[in-house]
Structures are given as structure tokens and as C-alpha cells.
Amino acid sequence: MKITTGQFNDSYFPIMDGVGMTAHNYARWLNEKYGKSMIVAPKGNDYEDHVPYKVYRFKSVLLPGMNPYRVGLPLIDIKFKKKIKKVGFDLVHAHCPFISGQLALNISKKLDIPFVTTFHTKYRDDFKKVINNDLIVDFLVNFTLDFYKAADLVLVPNKATGLTLEEYGFKGPYEIMPNGSDMIVPEKLKLISFRKKGLKMIDAGTDEFVMLFVGQHRWEKNIRLIIDSLRQLKLKGKSFKMVFVGEGYAAGDMKKLVRKYELQDNVVFLGVMTDRNELQKVYAASDLFVFPSVYDNSPLVIQEAAAFGVPSIVVRNSSSAESILDGVNGFLIENETADLTKKLMALMQNQHAIKIAGEGARKSIYHPWESIIDDVYYRYTELIKFHKPSK
């Protein structure tokens, strides 16, 4: 059964965040295996799309204080409205509850088709960052809950994310649909080649201890914890290289902090990397993936690192830690600078422990998107077959 589906999200290329990558991989694999799937998202400046599926873009403006994110303006984009009206969707899937999500909901009502949404993000944290009023924050959280209540199917990427949704007050049913990875586990010779090229990219020696962070450069990601720990490592005379990949509003202040701590020789900022082939080389060159975020729900980057046998360090009891067993397929720390520093110092002296955890991560954490999409397609077709037209 071939189906036509739309993936709606407020972030998409050239923004390289986890939710945008999820929407991309849904569209990519559904389009390749099960019919037609397309992305509906805001325009990104003069960015040109080069993907194997259709992309429908609508006008947008930069979101103040949240660079590189944008606010979509589909209602005033006449050309976009004409184009999207001609698409015969069988089902629409929203990956956020805001502009593009509301657009998907409206389309589902007009066409009388199933509406699916995934709860990806801790929206209350986002609201609190820009709004210093608990009443308004509660109002916005309730607004998002109404959105999820309107869906025929609500998905979450893991158990912890579902619990967050319940904490917000959602009482309806939801299903776990895990995220996957578009990275391919490289063969041994390929991995060696990637590593050699990656070390050259970051100007690191073959025996240098390399740590990596990939993600939006936002303080919510707990990046300050990383930089503070790096300072402690430097004061203790440790040799290392820390690589940051990504962009975001905090990037400038992160660089200032690195200079303040005199870490310029130890830290590399590569910026956003849209070329996934180049990013593979950076993963391959790394010993550890350091991701202490307590904001993220089910970060794709941990799976990406696992594909290259690189274990992650995450905060104990965070959503990111749900699939990690300490020392088995990753490492757990308390949300403290001292504990991260202690763990890093111990692992610098124990490459065997890193290797064991890296192999465990590759076997238990990494899952290719292609297999995930088979399950997505099954649920989509069930919804389409048993959808009851509204009266």
C-alpha cells in the first residue's frame, strides 16, 4: 500500500537539530520505501534543498534571541498555500505543536485524514527561558497539550519523554516510537581512514585524547558543565582536545569562556556541519562523546556516536541516560563539574574501558532509521485504514 504523507516541523535544513533530522529521515525513508513523503517547513534564508523528496517551504523570519531558529508565516505565503492545497495527503505528521504543527492539524481537518504528532521537546523549559511569568508559561503548556489531545496518534521517542508529557498534564494514550540513525556503521578499514582524516581536520595527534559534543550551542544543553570541566583538566596538567560541532545563540559566549580559561589550544569549534560525510570523520576521530544535557529527550547524536564505537557520557537519570548502563555501553555522571572531571580523568587512563563501552554502544544503542520506518509505516497504514470520517 503506497501512501502520501507530510512531515511538518518548524526546524529543518540548514538547521541541524535532532527534531529536524528526525523529520528528514521520516520523509527520506517513507519516500524511498512506501510511497510519497515530503517535508513542510519554514524557508531558511537562501538555502537550496537537495534531498530525494519534495520540500514545501513557507515564508519565515528569524526568531529573536534564538538564532538560527525561525518563525514561519504560512498564512501570508500565497504561493505556498496554492502548492500545498494541491497535495493529496493520506496522513500528516507534526513534529512540533507550533506554526507548522497547527498547519498540519488544520490540513488534517480540511481533508478529514489522520493526524499524527510526536512529542520531542521539553517545551516548558523553552517557555521559561523567554517568559518570566509562570501563569503565561502554564497557559502555553496547556495550549500544547490541547494540540496533542487533537491527534489520532501521539508518539514519543522513549519512556522518559512519555513521562515528561504526563508531567505536563497529558492524560491520553501515547506510543513509543524510538529514533534511529542515518549513520552507517563503517567497516574496520573505513573507520581507520575516517579517523585519520578526522584527526587532521581537528589538528589532533594520533595519541591525543579527543572528546566531542555535537548539537545546538545553547546553555540549556549544559555546555557550561563541559567547559568548566575542561578548565579543571587543564589545571591538572592533562592533555586533550575538545571538539564542538554545531551552532546556536550561546556560541559566542562559549568561545569567550574558552578564551577566559585559556583553553584555545585545547578546544576546536567546527561550527555547523551539514555534510554528513565530513561529520563521520569527526565522530571516528573521537574517543568520547560528552553530552551532559538534561534538556534533551532522545538525542540522535548519541546513536550517531555509537555507530562509530564512541561511547557517551551523560547525566544519571536524565532522559538521555535511559538506554545507558554505566561502563557497559556508556558512562553516567552526576550533574556536577567535579564528577564529570573525575570521570574524564579516570577514562583518560583507561582506554580499555572506553573500548568496551564503545562496542556495547554500537550493539545496543545504534539503530538504523530504515528499520524504525518499517514500524512507522505499519502504524500509519493502520490509522489510514481504520480512520472514521467526521460527520
Region roles according to the model:
Residues A41, Y56-K59, V141-S193:
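Donor nucleotide-sugar binding/catalytic pocket of nucleotide-sugar-dependent glycosyltransferases
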Residues V294:
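Aromatic "clamp/platform" in nucleotide-sugar-dependent glycosyltransferases that forms part
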Residues D326-G327, F331-T337, A346-Q351:
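Conserved acidic donor-binding segment of nucleotide-sugar-dependent glycosyltransferases
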Residues K255-M273:
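Nucleotide-activated donor-binding/catalytic signature segment of Leloir-type glycosyltransferases, i.e.
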Residues A353-H367:
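A short, well-ordered alpha-helix in the C-terminal region of glycosyltransferases
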